[in-house]
Amino acid sequence: MNQWRVIHNKSYEGAMNMAIDEAIFTAYKKGHNKPTLRFYTWEPACLSIGYFQKLEDEIDLDKCRCMNIDYTRRITGGRAVLHDNELTYSIIIGEDNPLIDKSINLSYRYISEGLVKGLNLSGIETDNLNRGERISRENLSAACFNAHASYEVTINNKKVIGSAQSRKDGVLLQHGSIILDFDVEKLFKLIKTKTPELKERAMKFTAKKASGIENEIGRKIDIDILQKNIVKGLAEQFNVEFVEGDLTDYEKQLVKELYEKYKNEEYNKKR
């Protein structure tokens, strides 16, 4: 049975979390590590924006500072995500791995199936995975959780896990937010819209489309137990053995270099 590395949950600021993900991604491209599953949380809470978003056009930076909300740009695409009461995962694996479909949608589905198995082991029932929905552009905001992409995990038809994927030089990085407690009002205090009326409409729309696991099942989740069960679910899905590990010395050096990039205002505002 193939062995993958798992790095268990630690809490970091946004720039550090993104630096670590990219360091693992880069090291894998150069043959320095195994396929890796990583869990992490965010301290302080952080608003991450997609690689192609325009930070100053879409995010209220003054409000972020006032509310002590960090912000950073992801290596992946998609829209803004408020990382607060959640467990985040990332998976780094070669595109040539037979488990990874060349289709982005089908690889999303395969990973989501493993996440669902982990939730089920935690006594959490989810909806059936589906191809997502066609969304009117009138309803779109800078926020990620106001639309269902293909094969995203939902409970009561509300997205509870939002993921984004990047592929480069034959390597796949997918990371995603497993939302425990979703605060839509807090999120939209940070999101810019053209008018207050549009913000109110977008907030109501998002509240119908997204939630947190705890909000939907009505009980608290032990994050350590959830993490262990997701490892089990993904191990079953991929038919691999996860071996606990940490960053290599090479990865740690990369993290130091990449951290400076993700902390740099010019990088975060470059679009």
Swiss-Prot record:
<protein>
    <recommendedName>
        <fullName>Octanoyltransferase LipM</fullName>
        <ecNumber>2.3.1.181</ecNumber>
    </recommendedName>
</protein>
<comment type="pathway">
    <text>Protein modification; protein lipoylation via endogenous pathway; protein N(6)-(lipoyl)lysine from octanoyl-[acyl-carrier-protein].</text>
</comment>
<feature type="domain" description="BPL/LPL catalytic">
    <location>
        <begin position="31"/>
        <end position="242"/>
    </location>
</feature>
<comment type="function">
    <text>Catalyzes the transfer of endogenously produced octanoic acid from octanoyl-acyl-carrier-protein onto the lipoyl domain of GcvH, an intermediate carrier during protein lipoylation.</text>
</comment>
<comment type="similarity">
    <text>Belongs to the octanoyltransferase LipM family.</text>
</comment>
<keyword id="KW-0012">Acyltransferase</keyword>
<comment type="subunit">
    <text>Monomer.</text>
</comment>
<dbReference type="InterPro" id="IPR050664">
    <property type="entry name" value="Octanoyltrans_LipM/LipL"/>
</dbReference>
<keyword id="KW-0808">Transferase</keyword>
<dbReference type="GO" id="GO:0036211">
    <property type="term" value="P:protein modification process"/>
</dbReference>
<dbReference type="GO" id="GO:0033819">
    <property type="term" value="F:lipoyl(octanoyl) transferase activity"/>
</dbReference>
<dbReference type="InterPro" id="IPR024898">
    <property type="entry name" value="LipM"/>
</dbReference>
<dbReference type="InterPro" id="IPR045864">
    <property type="entry name" value="aa-tRNA-synth_II/BPL/LPL"/>
</dbReference>
<feature type="site" description="Lowers pKa of active site Cys">
    <location>
        <position position="159"/>
    </location>
</feature>
<feature type="active site" description="Acyl-thioester intermediate">
    <location>
        <position position="144"/>
    </location>
</feature>
<dbReference type="GO" id="GO:0009107">
    <property type="term" value="P:lipoate biosynthetic process"/>
</dbReference>
<dbReference type="InterPro" id="IPR004143">
    <property type="entry name" value="BPL_LPL_catalytic"/>
</dbReference>
<dbReference type="Pfam" id="PF21948">
    <property type="entry name" value="LplA-B_cat"/>
</dbReference>
